[in-house]
């Protein structure tokens, strides 16, 4: 079993399988589910009950092809977040950088400690997974660090990040990660603006933004930028034991 995985359950006749994966939070993420068909709901429920018997809080994406939302609801799970894919023209939000914070291209911040601090701003957000140093080194996963940006506080610590990928005229980013104590500020939109402005200089015209665990206020703010949610997948959390 891979290091991030802790346990797995297989249904009879290969009707379904789920595994539990570690996350940066207390919950374990459920991966897999039950094959589509007349017994899907029954098999999915049985697998989830077995996993829940561990007593550990669990989270799972509602997916009609594997884990239908109505099965999660029947078991008492509650929607606690969502994955959203936003699309639209590159936005230019009017914003300001909070006092004591500076924003610079990721290419100018190669130090792994600083990058790790910035990446950890996602740690409490439902849907985000564990990352290794190999995932955050300059250029990891073909990210364009000329375009992606990082925010540093007065002590030089990473307090925000927006990683970026360019493909022709399309910029793809993850929703900016912000240190909890700064989430009430305009830093999220400041990072987004800096990244979009840099992408525009390289010919980008359109944005694809992937967001996990954003708050309702952040979701509304993205709607107000003229972006359209083309994919929304609810994320459920098991009820406390």
What are these regions (language model features)?
Residues 1-52, 158-180:
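Conserved donor-binding loop and adjoining core beta-sheet/short helix segment
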Residues 11-13, 22-23, 88, 152-154, ...:
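Active-site beta-strand termini and strand-to-loop segments that position acidic
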Residues 15-16, 76, 80-82, 159-160, ...:
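A structural microfeature
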Residues 24, 35-102, 219, 232-241:
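Acyl-donor-binding surface of acyltransferase catalytic domains
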Residues 37-53, 184-201, 224:
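Conserved acetyl-CoA-binding loop-helix of GNAT-fold acetyltransferases
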Residues 53-64, 199-211:
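Conserved GNAT acetyl-CoA-binding A-motif
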Residues 94-171:
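Flexible, substrate/cofactor-facing loop regions flanked by secondary structure
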Residues 200-241:
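Short hairpin/turn module used for nucleic-acid contact or packing/dimerization
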């Amino acid at each position: 079993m891979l290091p991030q995985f802790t346990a797995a359950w297989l249904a009879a006749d290969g009707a379904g399988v789920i595994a539990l994966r570690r996350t940066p939070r207390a919950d374990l993420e459920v991966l897999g589910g039950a094959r589509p068909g007349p017994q899907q709901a029954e098999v999915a429920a049985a697998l989830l009950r077995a996993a829940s018997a561990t007593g550990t809080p669990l989270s799972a994406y509602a997916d009609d092809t594997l884990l239908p939302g109505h099965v999660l609801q029947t078991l008492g799970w509650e929607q606690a977040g969502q994955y959203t894919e936003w699309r639209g023209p590159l936005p230019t939000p009017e914003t300001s950088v909070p006092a004591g914070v500076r924003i610079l291209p990721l290419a100018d911040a190669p130090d792994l400690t600083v990058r790790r601090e910035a990446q950890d701003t996602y740690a409490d957000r439902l849907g985000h997974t564990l990352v290794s140093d190999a995932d955050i080194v300059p250029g990891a996963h073909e990210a364009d660090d000329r375009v992606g940006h990082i925010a540093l506080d007065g002590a030089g610590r990473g307090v925000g990040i927006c990683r970026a990928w360019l493909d022709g005229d399309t910029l793809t980013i993850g929703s900016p990660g912000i240190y909890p104590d700064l989430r009430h500020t305009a830093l999220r939109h400041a990072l987004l603006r800096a990244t979009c402005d840099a992408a525009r200089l390289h010919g980008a015209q359109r944005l694809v933004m992937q967001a996990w665990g954003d708050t309702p206020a952040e979701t509304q703010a993205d709607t107000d930028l003229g972006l359209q949610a083309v994919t929304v997948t609810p994320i459920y959390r098991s009820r406390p034991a």
